[in-house]
Amino acid sequence: MKKFNYLFLILSVLSLALTSCDKDDKESDTEDVYFEIDPSGSREWTAEELADELYGAEGSAAGEENAKLRKLFLENVAAHEAELCDELGTNGVAMGYIGYKYYYQSQDVNGDTRTLSARVVWARYRLFGWHNLDPDNLYIMEHPFITDNADAPSECTSFEMGLSTQDYLLISPDGLGYGINKEMIDPYQNHEVSVKNSLDALEAGYAVWKKYGSGTMEDDWKTIILGLSEGAGKALALHRYFDTHDDEASKWHFSHSFTCAGSYDPSCTWETYYDWGGTEYVAVIPMTIKSMLASYPDMLKGYSEDDFYCKKYLAVKSQIDALLAGKNMSYKEQDAKIKELLGTQTPTLGDVLSETFLDKNSGIYKAFVKCLEKNDLSTGWTPKHTIKILASKSDGFMPYASTEAIKNAFGDMVTVTSIANCDHSDICDLYHTAYTTVVW
């Protein structure tokens, strides 16, 4: 019940993040935007079916909290169905949802063209056949830190789809390293690449909706960027792009971002790990190293991957690499296996990193931090739209210091809702729950 109680304590604050307001004047030409639909990954849901997949079937063992969320979900759907009945002057309207898995073109860390995958979802209603609804708002959802490709947006019915319980258009990119590109390294915390991937997913997802959906947005629609954990940094990076490209912000009716538990200043996050002597989730260490080596080979020229690790870690590195590359375990399962390989339930940085890399005055450390600093979202721009952040002060994976860096940099442009005692998993669950229950 802890997470559920947290939810209702802060719903009034979180609801401030959900306002929308401009006429649908976006008439961008989508005819030349490449996309390809994957029929095997495209789905249709009734409201009941979506509720079952999100929260568990009625009477299942999904837990008391999920049962309450399921009830709220269906109550709000019923209220919206009643509104549609009044609007249409009839009875018997039933809400439903449709989602398309699609492929689109973007770029990898080397600037090479890649085909990526994503999912777009929107609401519809049934009355003598199915009819697409005009979306109120467009949401871009950057997925959280995931270790199992089955949790990629295009592969599953994810919590973010709870946003579609009214008339929303939801676009969720898999990003590099997941979906069709699951064999690739996740360019973790490389915000330049993630922004390019997300913009291309947005263009292609919108084109999919224009072809298969209603093709018309409601008056006063806005684009809102969402993201949690790994996706929070991606979301704020996309926010920065819009705030430094006025034409794009206007084109997409950009409103604001609402993120949770992210690494917005990667060098601050990394230095906090050093201050702590470790992190709640040890796999983030090799994932970050692999990403920086792949993303900035010139800046890390002369250093091999092995240079970052101690002998103890190197002895099991091939096994850990296989776990990371497999992308077929939950993060808890993967974390437990890595700790087993390291022979400790409380691994420190000394169990992973070399003495040289642990030295903040070493060349390898300074070069690595410079790579992270290229992705610092707390400097180099001035926000024009509100940044809303949910964070835990006791998050052992995504340090609160990173949220503080954004608040300190941008002051009143940033609204932070903080929880004192909540781990990373719980704060992410709270974010999902809050958005699923507040936005209708």
Q: What kind of feature is each model-predicted range?
A:
Residues 188-212:
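Alpha/beta-hydrolase active-site loop
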Residues 383, 388-395:
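Short beta-strand/loop motif that positions the catalytic acidic residue
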Residues 110-117, 121-165, 174, 181:
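Short, surface-exposed "cap/lid" segments of acyl-processing enzymes
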Residues 17-20:
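C-terminal motif of bacterial Sec signal peptides marking the signal peptidase cleavage site
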Residues 204-280:
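Primarily recognizes the serine-hydrolase "nucleophile elbow" in alpha/beta-hydrolase
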Residues 37, 41, 260-380:
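Accessory cap/linker subdomain of secreted extracellular hydrolases
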Residues 27-126:
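Catalytic-loop region of hydrolases
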Residues 271, 364, 369-371, 397, ...:
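C-terminal catalytic histidine-bearing segment of alpha/beta-hydrolase fold enzymes
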